[in-house]
């Protein structure tokens, strides 16, 4: 197993299936991981059972603490939990699992500092670890800009 640490602006190639993105932190803050996605424009539309799991070409959406997604149907992305709710410190972790990118044009992995205006990521101890096969790619959240959003990966 190898580990790569990415700094702001650096890039690395990521394969197209079975990817884990884990946000971890211990500070007393509610951080949230998101996966924003867009379906490929050339896929065949299909209806889901009871309106769940269907897909349209170019369809956009997000997986986050309100919509945890699914590994069993489109978009093949799932969030395991919402940690740190109420600014609870400790061994907080949230993991997004992407089972397949076959029907997706792209996915953005982003982090949000929930309900804290006028703050930045350097104030906390967050990091995102991408597990791709046996490799780990670590992205420390150290931006000092006054911003509550950070895009970690464009897949």
Residue ranges of each PLM-predicted region?
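Intrinsic-disorder/low-complexity signal
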Residues: 1-106, 110-155
């Amino acid at each position: 197993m190898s580990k790569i640490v990415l700094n702001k602006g650096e890039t690395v190639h990521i394969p197209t299936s079975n990817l884990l993105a884990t946000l971890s932190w211990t500070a007393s803050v509610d951080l949230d991981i998101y996966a924003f996605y867009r379906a490929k424009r050339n896929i065949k539309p299909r209806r889901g059972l009871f309106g769940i799991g269907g897909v349209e070409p170019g369809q956009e959406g997000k997986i986050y603490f309100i919509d945890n997604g699914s590994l069993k149907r489109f978009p093949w992305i799932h969030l395991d939990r919402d940690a740190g709710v109420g600014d609870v410190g400790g061994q907080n972790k949230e993991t997004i699992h992407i089972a397949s990118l076959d029907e997706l044009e792209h996915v953005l992995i982003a982090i949000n500092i929930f309900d804290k205006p006028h703050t930045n990521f350097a104030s906390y101890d967050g990091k995102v670890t991408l597990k791709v096969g046996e490799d780990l790619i670590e992205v420390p959240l150290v931006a000092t800009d006054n911003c509550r959003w950070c895009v970690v990966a464009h897949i």
